[in-house]
Amino acid sequence: MGKIKIGINGFGRIGRLVARVALQSDDVELVAVNDPFITTEYMTYMFKYDTVHGHWKHSDIKLKDDKTLLFGEKPVTVFGVRNPEEIPWGEAGADYVVESTGVFTDKDKAAAHLKGGAKKVVISAPSKDAPMFVVGVNEDKYTSDVNIVSNASCTTNCLAPLAKVINDNFGIIEGLMTTVHAITATQKTVDGPSSKDWRGGRAASFNIIPSSTGAAKAVGKVLPELNGKLTGMSFRVPTVDVSVVDLTVRTEKAASYDDIKKAIKAASEGKLKGIMGYVEEDLVSTDFVGDSRSSIFDAKAGIALNDHFVKLVSWYDNEWGYSNRVVDLIRHMAKTQ
């Protein structure tokens, strides 16, 4: 199999990091990027310098012309088209398109990319109607006739592997999740208008902001056996990257906290290696910046009330870990063709 050729629509946080992942991969080739709101020159600057993930050090990046970026000797075509139907992905050779604008998240809107010659589209956000896949949890349910998929959310990617391990080993009766989540681009630097979510309009770097999240309910879509058993909420906190899931569950089978730790450790070294992590050191959020795993279980942070009721804590780099999974999902789809 030749290299998997991908295009990226939307060069925001996830778009740029998916590009970084692709450019460091031997089996994936970034061939095109579309963003109507930034110039090619500005694109090179935004890609090269990153407050959280640091300078790009893997190759020189320069402008060949206003339609081409050069990463070392590797040319990447740049488009600035607003209407996804009109982006000529086919001409650029992009078979897989990462839809990371945050705008075209439903099936019909994302399908517009197919008209420009893309063969498959991966939405880097939850979708109300496109099938959602979480690598390590349900990607084996993907079939090659499906052209539009969602990689779910970063929080679902952290929660679902953890919930799967607990449910497979001990059974989950019910559970509540809280994610303590780093700020994202949708928030405000100072208090501003946010008519749908009043709290969300308050200054991100100065407040702990309670918020809603569909991440726990979405686990029921990727793990149908947990449908209706989990729900959750979010606190947005003033850090720029890395979030943490707190999952509190009642289990069917009696299990000590040690039993649970052993099951998660075994999964992290076995089937879920590279997806699930396990740490016993006294770590804090910045220690996970740049961690490519979806969910890193913090063995010391969790606590059990009794053998049926337990609180579990798992970290995730909500930018880098998630962007790695987007590329992993594309790899899996390519293998399935």
Swiss-Prot record:
<keyword id="KW-0560">Oxidoreductase</keyword>
<dbReference type="GO" id="GO:0051287">
    <property type="term" value="F:NAD binding"/>
</dbReference>
<dbReference type="GO" id="GO:0050661">
    <property type="term" value="F:NADP binding"/>
</dbReference>
<dbReference type="GO" id="GO:0006096">
    <property type="term" value="P:glycolytic process"/>
</dbReference>
<feature type="active site" description="Nucleophile">
    <location>
        <position position="154"/>
    </location>
</feature>
<dbReference type="InterPro" id="IPR020830">
    <property type="entry name" value="GlycerAld_3-P_DH_AS"/>
</dbReference>
<dbReference type="InterPro" id="IPR020828">
    <property type="entry name" value="GlycerAld_3-P_DH_NAD(P)-bd"/>
</dbReference>
<comment type="pathway">
    <text>Carbohydrate degradation; glycolysis; pyruvate from D-glyceraldehyde 3-phosphate: step 1/5.</text>
</comment>
<dbReference type="Pfam" id="PF00044">
    <property type="entry name" value="Gp_dh_N"/>
</dbReference>
<feature type="binding site">
    <location>
        <begin position="13"/>
        <end position="14"/>
    </location>
    <ligand>
        <name>NAD(+)</name>
    </ligand>
</feature>
<protein>
    <recommendedName>
        <fullName>Glyceraldehyde-3-phosphate dehydrogenase 1, cytosolic</fullName>
        <ecNumber>1.2.1.12</ecNumber>
    </recommendedName>
</protein>
<keyword id="KW-0324">Glycolysis</keyword>
<dbReference type="InterPro" id="IPR020829">
    <property type="entry name" value="GlycerAld_3-P_DH_cat"/>
</dbReference>
<feature type="binding site">
    <location>
        <position position="236"/>
    </location>
    <ligand>
        <name>D-glyceraldehyde 3-phosphate</name>
    </ligand>
</feature>
<keyword id="KW-0520">NAD</keyword>
<feature type="binding site">
    <location>
        <position position="184"/>
    </location>
    <ligand>
        <name>D-glyceraldehyde 3-phosphate</name>
    </ligand>
</feature>
<comment type="subunit">
    <text>Homotetramer.</text>
</comment>
<comment type="function">
    <text>Key enzyme in glycolysis that catalyzes the first step of the pathway by converting D-glyceraldehyde 3-phosphate (G3P) into 3-phospho-D-glyceroyl phosphate. Essential for the maintenance of cellular ATP levels and carbohydrate metabolism.</text>
</comment>
<feature type="binding site">
    <location>
        <begin position="213"/>
        <end position="214"/>
    </location>
    <ligand>
        <name>D-glyceraldehyde 3-phosphate</name>
    </ligand>
</feature>
<dbReference type="GO" id="GO:0005829">
    <property type="term" value="C:cytosol"/>
</dbReference>
<feature type="binding site">
    <location>
        <position position="35"/>
    </location>
    <ligand>
        <name>NAD(+)</name>
    </ligand>
</feature>
<feature type="binding site">
    <location>
        <begin position="153"/>
        <end position="155"/>
    </location>
    <ligand>
        <name>D-glyceraldehyde 3-phosphate</name>
    </ligand>
</feature>
<dbReference type="InterPro" id="IPR020831">
    <property type="entry name" value="GlycerAld/Erythrose_P_DH"/>
</dbReference>
<feature type="site" description="Activates thiol group during catalysis">
    <location>
        <position position="181"/>
    </location>
</feature>
<dbReference type="InterPro" id="IPR006424">
    <property type="entry name" value="Glyceraldehyde-3-P_DH_1"/>
</dbReference>
<comment type="similarity">
    <text>Belongs to the glyceraldehyde-3-phosphate dehydrogenase family.</text>
</comment>
<feature type="binding site">
    <location>
        <position position="318"/>
    </location>
    <ligand>
        <name>NAD(+)</name>
    </ligand>
</feature>
<feature type="binding site">
    <location>
        <position position="82"/>
    </location>
    <ligand>
        <name>NAD(+)</name>
    </ligand>
</feature>
<keyword id="KW-0963">Cytoplasm</keyword>
<dbReference type="Pfam" id="PF02800">
    <property type="entry name" value="Gp_dh_C"/>
</dbReference>
<dbReference type="GO" id="GO:0004365">
    <property type="term" value="F:glyceraldehyde-3-phosphate dehydrogenase (NAD+) (phosphorylating) activity"/>
</dbReference>
<dbReference type="InterPro" id="IPR036291">
    <property type="entry name" value="NAD(P)-bd_dom_sf"/>
</dbReference>
<dbReference type="GO" id="GO:0006006">
    <property type="term" value="P:glucose metabolic process"/>
</dbReference>
